[in-house]
Design a protein with these regions (language model features):
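Membrane-water interface regions at transmembrane-helix termini and the short interhelical loops
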Residues: 81-94, 182-186, 214-215
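Hydrophobic alpha-helical transmembrane segments of integral membrane proteins
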Residues: 165-215, 234, 238-245
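Elongated alpha-helical scaffolds
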Residues: 102-105
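Hydrophobic alpha-helical bundle architecture
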Residues: 187-191, 220-229
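Gly/Ser-rich, low-complexity
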Residues: 1-72, 88-97, 107-177, 216-221, ...
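Hydrophobic alpha-helical transmembrane segments in multi-pass membrane proteins
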Residues: 67, 71, 75, 79, ...
Length: 288
């Protein structure tokens, strides 16, 4: 009878250990997958992310918004010319050089405005190039291999049936947590790209104000926001890389309970920090 009880206990322990290791291995595989997916998403340019959406945004920007921006630029240039003429004693002291300077400045503004879409895309090409270079380094240093879990499995083999059952239930809950985290990351990464498209569609309007000292703050702040959104992808990638390294430390710690609940804590921390990356990027570039 004792033999049967021991056999049943050992069989249940093996079953639970296999279930726990399966959950944890799947959990850590999810970490690697998330790092790869985020690196691919935030490292993609707006043109490559979705060709159909990109074409739509370009048409809206160049056919609907650009003519309105042309009117804005006309107002800005006229306002600046009048202001320049009135500065010299109500046109009594007229300097022809100022007219040449105004013509040159207006011509540059028209050239920039007519190429606004390409300039905006160049900003994102630069940021995506930096992100793509960083993604290769980050992915190579955060991969979690199966041999890291060998020590953890040895610890589980020395535990009783009751604690193993509790750990199995907890590890199953963590799997659900990781799926929720995946949804949050999906919303944040895709939301960032949609924000990029929205900012790009209206780009000519703030760019039209850049040539004026008084009104140029609108255009300058837009460019700062543009760089902030572009390099937000870098901050997202850094957050996930830090998370993966912390998870790697859990996997090699040999403490099953700590591994499970540490993963919960780090997952919540990751989601919290991902939502703060936009604000951090804006503070770095001085956008508001």
């Amino acid at each position: 009878m004792d033999f049967l009880t021991d056999w049943l206990t050992n069989w249940l322990k093996e079953l639970l250990i296999g279930g726990i290791m399966g959950n944890l291995e799947g959990l850590f595989d999810t970490v690697n997958t998330q790092v790869g997916e985020i690196a691919a998403q935030v490292g993609t340019t707006p043109a490559a992310w979705n060709a159909g959406v990109f074409s739509l945004i370009r048409q809206l920007s160049e056919t609907v918004i650009l003519p309105i921006a042309g009117l804005v630029l006309t107002f800005v240039a006229t306002y600046e010319l009048i202001q320049m003429l009135l500065e010299k004693n109500n046109m009594h002291e007229f300097d022809v050089a100022n007219i040449y300077k105004w013509v040159f400045k207006t011509a540059c503004a028209i050239l920039i405005l007519s190429n606004t879409f390409d300039i905006v895309m160049a900003v994102f090409d630069v940021s995506q190039s930096v992100i793509a270079d960083a993604a290769g380094l980050i992915q190579g240093s955060t991969d979690i291999t199966p041999d890291m879990l060998a020590e953890l499995e040895t610890t589980l083999e020395g535990m009783d049936l009751g604690p193993l059952l509790g750990l199995w239930l907890q590890s199953s809950v963590i799997g659900l947590t990781m799926q929720i985290m995946g949804i949050i990351i999906f919303v944040l990464v895709y939301g960032r790209m949609i924000e990029i498209y929205l900012m790009t569609s209206l780009a000519p309007l703030p760019v039209a104000t850049l040539s004026n000292r008084e009104l140029g703050g609108t255009g300058q702040n837009y460019l700062k926001s543009l760089f902030a959104v572009g390099f937000q992808g870098m901050l997202i990638l850094v957050c996930v890389a830090i998370y993966a390294v912390l998870i790697q430390g859990i996997a090699t710690g040999g403490d099953p309970i700590g591994a499970i609940w540490g993963t919960v804590g780090y997952t919540v921390l990751l989601c919290f920090m991902l939502f703060k990356t936009g604000g951090i990027a804006q503070r770095i570039f001085g956008a508001h």
